[in-house]
């Protein structure tokens, strides 16, 4: 999101308005291994959330009971024709990952978002994210 000072009493004005597929807040809800889906309870305190807004993403891993922080990363993203691509601008766990791009195939089924590809470590992954209501 880009903003600019209007230099008057009305404050700030949002100037970007890119709304891409998948925009919103998502909770990691499971993985697919072979043909088996394994879901996790998103009401548990350990969470990974991914926020997608105006062509930018951020993920954060945290614990809602202890307020522990496990990591974060983010940058820009695109989602079109079944391909979700992240361009990493920051990554708290390994700054050597900054500047890389990760591409995934994606499929949205109802409130679920499936994405499949290689992790930032190069390992195969097939994740399931569930849309988080405000």
Place the predicted regions along the sequence by residue:
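Short, surface-exposed coil-to-beta transition loops
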Residues: 7, 42-46, 69-74, 98-102, ...
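Conserved small/polar residues in nucleotide/adenosyl-binding loops
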Residues: 1-5
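Short, solvent-exposed aromatic-acidic interface loops
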Residues: 8-13, 33, 64, 89-94, ...
């Amino acid at each position: 999101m880009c903003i600019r000072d209007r230099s008057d009493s009305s404050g700030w004005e949002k100037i970007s308005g890119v709304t891409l597929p998948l925009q919103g807040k998502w909770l990691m809800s499971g993985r697919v291994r072979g043909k088996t889906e394994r879901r996790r309870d998103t009401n548990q305190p350990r969470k990974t959330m991914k926020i997608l807004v105006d062509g930018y993403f951020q993920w954060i891993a945290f614990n809602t009971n202890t307020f522990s922080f496990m990591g974060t990363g983010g940058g820009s993203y695109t989602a079109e024709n079944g391909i979700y691509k992240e361009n990493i601008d920051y990554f708290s766990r390994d700054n050597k990952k900054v500047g890389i791009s990760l591409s995934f195939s994606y499929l949205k089924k109802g409130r679920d978002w499936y994405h499949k590809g290689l992790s930032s470590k190069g390992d195969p992954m097939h994740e399931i994210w569930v849309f988080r209501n405000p």
